[in-house]
Amino acid sequence: MGRFDQRWVSVVVLAAGIALLPGLLYLFGLALVEGRPQPADRAPSGVAACSSEPRTGFQPMNPWSFATQFFDDDAMKKKVPEVEREAFWIARRHLWRQPRHDMVRWHLSSTALTIWITRNWSAAQIADTARKEDFCRAWSKRRAPDGPMKR
């Protein structure tokens, strides 16, 4: 094999590795999680939704779209959809119930589990579970104009 062929193979292998990296990190992050959370059957009646934001047209996350957000200035400025935020809360709560690990494993597994939840649960299941776990009340206190998260 000539020098040109070796360089070409190296470039192809490098490009394939970069393209596969988000998916491999997602699978590794899921492997770090013990079990998977179960969606709530229905939220208790009388418990308000976290947001009046419409849940139609919800697009499940995937490892590649998540990774590309870091390179897209417009995506970084956009508000995170409530469904994704609620999925993150659910993932975080599930991980709190497991043995603690270092920060890199925590972030990798919470991101992977958030992606998994958005891909395997409906928007209604995510909302019902967030309401049942009482995430909405805690979040609304932080968002209140005079709440603890005031800037």
Question: PLM features: what roles do these ranges have?
Answer:
Residues 2-151:
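Juxtamembrane regions of bacterial inner-membrane/periplasmic proteins
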